[in-house]
């Protein structure tokens, strides 16, 4: 490999690293909301999986504890899926053009 090509690759890698750092900071600010029980339980979290809020409709507090626990878990899982999808969408542009194998996931 020529010296100029190597320098170009190093510069490209450094720029990508800077862009990824900026995107990570942005993802920490983006909030998604997961729901279950037709919106009776809501979990709001960032795309970095930091939970910001859990909202439980008061009508559920007198109900079955097991059902409430299941609804909270389902809302949390819904929020995680939405956070992952949003992160993949936002980060997808950064990896386009890279020769990565299909299905390869970088640690976002």
Swiss-Prot record:
Pfam families: YbaB_DNA_bd (PF02575)
Annotated InterPro entries: YbaB-like_sf (IPR036894), YbaB/EbfC (IPR004401)
Compartment list: Cytoplasm, Nucleoid
Stretches with biased composition (Pro residues): 99-108
GO terms, molecular function: DNA binding
Main location (coarse class): cytoplasm
SUPFAM superfamilies referenced in this protein's UniProt entry, alphabetically: YbaB-like
GO CC list: bacterial nucleoid; cytosol
Domain of life of the native organism: Bacteria
Gene3D superfamilies in the record: Nucleoid-associated protein YbaB-like domain
Region Disordered, residue ranges: 87-108
Alphabetized UniProt keyword annotations: Cytoplasm, DNA-binding
HAMAP family: DNA_YbaB_EbfC
Family: Belongs to the YbaB/EbfC family.
Function: Binds to DNA and alters its conformation. May be involved in regulation of gene expression, nucleoid organization and DNA protection.
Subunit organization: Homodimer.
Protein's name according to its UniProt entry: Nucleoid-associated protein Bphy_0952
Organism per entry: Paraburkholderia phymatum (strain DSM 17167 / CIP 108236 / LMG 21445 / STM815) (Burkholderia phymatum)
